[in-house]
Amino acid sequence: MASEGEGVLKKEGLPEKLRILPLRNMVLYPDLVLPLHVTRAGYRRLADEVYRENGLLAVVAQRNEEAEEASPADIYQVGTVGSIIKLLKQADGTYQIIVGASEKVRLRNISQAGDYLEAEVEAVPEDRSTSPEIEALALNLRMGFQKFVSLASLPLDLANFALNAERPMQLVYAVASHLALSVVERQSILEMPETKAALEHVTFYMTRQLEKLELAQRIQDRVKSVMDKRQRDYYLREQLQAIRKELGEGEDTSEEVHELAARLRDLEMPAEARGAAEKEIERLGRMSPSAPEYHVSRNYLDWLLEMPWSVSTEDRIDVRQAAVILDEDHFDLEKVKRRILEYLAVLQLKKDLKGPILCFVGPPGVGKTSLGQSIARTLGRKFLRISLGGVRDEAEIRGHRRTYVGALPGRIVQGLRRVGSNNPVFMLDEIDKIGMDFRGDPSSALLEVLDPEQNFSFSDHYLGVPFDLSRVMFIATGNLLDTVPAALKDRMEVIEIPGYTAEEKLEIARKFLVERETANHGLTSDHIRIGEDAILEIIRSYTREAGVRSLQRNLASVCRNTAKAIAEGASGPIHIDASGIPEILGPVQFLPETATRSWGCGIATGLAWTPSGGQLIFIETLRTHGNGKLLLTGQLGEVMKESATAALTFVRAHAADLEIEGEEFDRSDIHVHVPAGATPKDGPSAGAPMVVALASLMTGREVRKDVAMTGEITLRGDILPVGGIKEKVLAARRAGVKEIMIPHANMKDLADIPDHLRRDMTIHELQTISDVLQLALLPSPRQGGSSPRS
């Protein structure tokens, strides 16, 4: 658009009707001129007529920019009165015209008149009000437009025209015509009745474009500065290379630096890491190969350039196939399998899902580590495992700072470089055995690794730049979480993997272990056949564990024995049944624990939970002449000692109900012992068997040898819930005990125990100490006996 000075025609009076010239993609403002290219035949005739008549027309923006022929509904209701100042016919038959606008009009009753539209027009008077605020807005717009003209490289006479605008609205239209606005925004400015609102809107639009221009200018200046610096660096580097060449040194260094720079160019990595690498390459280029720091710098660059910054393995997201793979590799473990399949299902819906942080907790040999490998195979990812057992130095996790001699990254970064992928399945084995000393606390360093809100920018001390661990699927394993700090435990999704029953071990042996061990020893089904009765005999008489490692070792012994027999000339297949197991493995190693013990008053069977699974414990008590002392042995922890004290206090308080003479306690010293004295023991779950053993000792009533019990006691006589119910039930079953007593609040935990196990066992629920005494103590030889009410 141009200014009024270029010849806008002013017409005296305004006709009632005007022919309409619709504009596409533009708006013509009052007091401005606009060059137009007219291609449509109807509007060429209109231009001819108006130009010959020296007449007027209504110049209005078209709503639908795509429409070739505008209808009444396609044009806006407000436009300008225009006249054709100049008309030039082109060689292709089209017209080039210049239209000047005089004033703003409103269109009414738009109708079709032959090839073009016409409408009744009504002049819209311009708002010429003034105020200090309007003057300030106009001044601000003038100054901003001057800056805009400078940044946008527009002709300077445009700025002069804006400065010389006589009226605020004239300034508004002049500035708006040179801004990059949409038709809707341009039309809204034209239709604004108030000067103040128009000034504010145009100032807003201009400020928005000024910000873009200033940003573009800053970027251009920055790029120019970088280019100038690179040219200068290149010139100086060439000079340095020439000097070194004259001195006979540095040619190999230059080639090495160029090779590293080429590797960096081809590598996709974060900007911060790239900046660190570029800086180190530049530093390396200034060093002599004989300098002590040269190899340190070179090793650091190798680590930076070989990290899998953007290298990922594609996930194999097939939930059904994943279920098949998990079932092929592991028997049971339904809770873990369900969690992995849920993760895959969500990953199928949300591709940028952060990797879960799982923690498998259970006894040794239940398949925690192998489960991680199976998960990696299911996902199609690489598998990485590090053992944290005995790790005491924080640098093992975070790495050493490069200032130290022999510095290396931590084991997290080392592992990722080794597998060459930024989304492996990363197993942190034995997390419960991590240590701490004067060199730092590795468990605190793991807080950042295992926190989804932080590990996207994990910083290794050696690398010195963040590495994104959010795509890594971390799996921690441990036997017991008691030693794991609460903050670290809170960051992990703990999934408990209990021990296996004899039936489950049999299935695992049949489906996995027998085939694996026979193959490991070069045997086939033509050489050996191991019967189910033989496997059960090994499970019951030669192993006592929650997992299957001892079972696997014993099966390996059977296979070695068979391989020896075949090597000596025996013909296969050799059938192994239960009767042949003692000949191979020797005498039976484990009998039911209750069957191996002498019984009498003062002995009760309890259930304990250890990192290796559940097991039976025996509470033994004896009374000697004394003065009421309580002696505790068997490496008991503080909690277990307190349970013994509470049990004795309860029995003394209810001596009358139990038909015990009160003086008996004052005349006797009581000794409580828990066998396996070399093994430390602690926990509240021995409270119930302790009170039973003490009551049996003082009353002379024997305890049933076919029952085991667990539960914490209170001085008021309540039985409180304890942990590890499934493991304890399995331990009782392994030991041949088919009747157990558990706290009432733990009955809900029986849902984790298979139905076939519960059907074979009798489980009593305990609410008070009265319940356990009534169930566990046999009647007195002298009389029926009684138990206290609590």
Swiss-Prot record:
GO molecular function ontology, one term from the record: sequence-specific DNA binding
Catalytic reaction list: Hydrolysis of proteins in presence of ATP
Cellular localisation: Cytoplasm
InterPro entries in the record: AAA+_ATPase (IPR003593), ATPase_AAA_core (IPR003959), Lon_bac (IPR027543), Lon_bac/euk-typ (IPR004815), Lon_lid (IPR054594), Lon_proteolytic (IPR008269), Lon_Prtase (IPR027065), Lon_prtase_N (IPR003111)
Pfam families to which the protein is assigned, alphabetical: AAA, Lon_C, Lon_lid, LON_substr_bdg
GO biological process, one term: protein quality control for misfolded or incompletely synthesized proteins
Keywords of the record: ATP-binding, Cytoplasm, Hydrolase, Nucleotide-binding, Protease, Serine protease, Stress response
Major location (coarse): cytoplasm
Top-level division of the source organism's lineage: Bacteria
SUPFAM superfamilies: P-loop containing nucleoside triphosphate hydrolases, PUA domain-like, Ribosomal protein S5 domain 2-like
Broad EC category: hydrolase
Catalytic site: S685, K728
Cellular component GO terms, alphabetical: cytoplasm
Stated induction or repression of this protein's expression: By heat shock.
Quaternary structure and partners: Homohexamer. Organized in a ring with a central cavity.
Name listed for the protein in its UniProt record: Lon protease 2
Organism per entry: Syntrophobacter fumaroxidans (strain DSM 10017 / MPOB)
Source lineage: Bacteria, Pseudomonadati, Thermodesulfobacteriota, Syntrophobacteria, Syntrophobacterales
Gene behind the chain: lon2
